[in-house]
Amino acid sequence: MSRYQDAGVDVNAGYELVHRIKDAVKSTDRPGVIGGIGSFGGMFDLEKLQVQHPILVSGTDGVGTKLLIAQQMNKHDTIGIDVVAMCVNDVLAQGAEPITFLDYIATGHNDPAKMAAIVSGVATGCREAGAALIGGETAEMPDMYAANEYDLAGTVTGIAEKEELLTTAGPQKGDILLGLPSSGLHSNGFSLVRQILFKDNHVKLTDRPEALRGKTVGETILTPTRIYVQAVLPLVHRKLVHGISHITGGGLIENVPRMLGDNLQAVIDPGRWPQLPVFDYLRVLGGLTKEDCFEAFNMGIGMVLAVAPDQVAQVQEILSNKNMTSYQIGYLRHCLPDTKKIVIK
């Protein structure tokens, strides 16, 4: 054993991991990728995209304490989808197409099988989003993390035609708000979720409460975050959306206003879309108010589009053709600059 291994860092495990993930990484390639893994930096040829006035849009994010659920369940092959989704949905909200992705894993012990499962999930998310996984880092830090612990983060670079960028100047009074359904909790609110389930009520991940309709608590809350890129990007290219909000931390209350100018207010009716069982389950179990729920969770809506009234039918048809359900959940109206930006009926 080398002195480095004696200190807790296994270089050979790192080599094995690279071998294990080669095929998964390669599966995400797209035109423009230069080289492969192992270089000092990932490279991409923007000329291959034939964008007239390219604007790069970057985003970085993690998965929060949802990681603890994956670690407790010893299920690591979907959490990578979450980190990709959190990043690519963010740049999509600016009108950008994700083109490249980098992942970062920090762990106390490099278990090649576990790390490869994580990267496999990252690759799955990248394929779904159309982004190439052009590099990453796995840092073995035995004095920073316990052997079975890891943290996961990602960085995406997207590209947009300058004239297709979405800003707060886009949404207009009278626009209809279309809600795209979430797959569940996505990757936000898990500190509250864990408080309700495990600290206040001693729920087990293997429990199958009637409210969850046959699913275990674990599989319900670990459901991967939905990726909206393939369904929504065609709308951006055709200039059929005025604004996009990715519903992440802070729920609808915090995120819908982020796409609005100072003189607009969103009016949203929760009765316009079906509620997922997990939210009612958490509300009842945690004794949460309506306000608590809408401030912490996406409440079944993962992305909101602002669309001109005369284009709603066309947009919904395009979404349907991409197997994406949509709901007319509200509208935009004029308000004074110091008025609250969203009303939940």
Swiss-Prot record:
GO cellular component assignments: cytosol
Enzyme superclass (EC): ligase
Primary subcellular site in the record, as a coarse category: cytoplasm
Cell compartment(s), UniProt: Cytoplasm
PANTHER family: TRIFUNCTIONAL PURINE BIOSYNTHETIC PROTEIN ADENOSINE-3, TRIFUNCTIONAL PURINE BIOSYNTHETIC PROTEIN ADENOSINE-3-RELATED
CDD domains xrefs: PurM
Reaction(s) catalysed (UniProt annotation): 2-formamido-N(1)-(5-O-phospho-beta-D-ribosyl)acetamidine + ATP = 5-amino-1-(5-phospho-beta-D-ribosyl)imidazole + ADP + phosphate + H(+)
A Pfam short name: AIRS_C
Pathway, per record: Purine metabolism; IMP biosynthesis via de novo pathway; 5-amino-1-(5-phospho-D-ribosyl)imidazole from N(2)-formyl-N(1)-(5-phospho-D-ribosyl)glycinamide: step 2/2
EC id: 6.3.3.1
GO MF annotation list: ATP binding; phosphoribosylamine-glycine ligase activity; phosphoribosylformylglycinamidine cyclo-ligase activity
Signal sequence extent: none
Originating species: Limosilactobacillus reuteri (strain DSM 20016)
Protein name per its UniProtKB record: Phosphoribosylformylglycinamidine cyclo-ligase
Assigned keywords, A-Z: ATP-binding, Cytoplasm, Ligase, Nucleotide-binding, Purine biosynthesis
Gene: purM
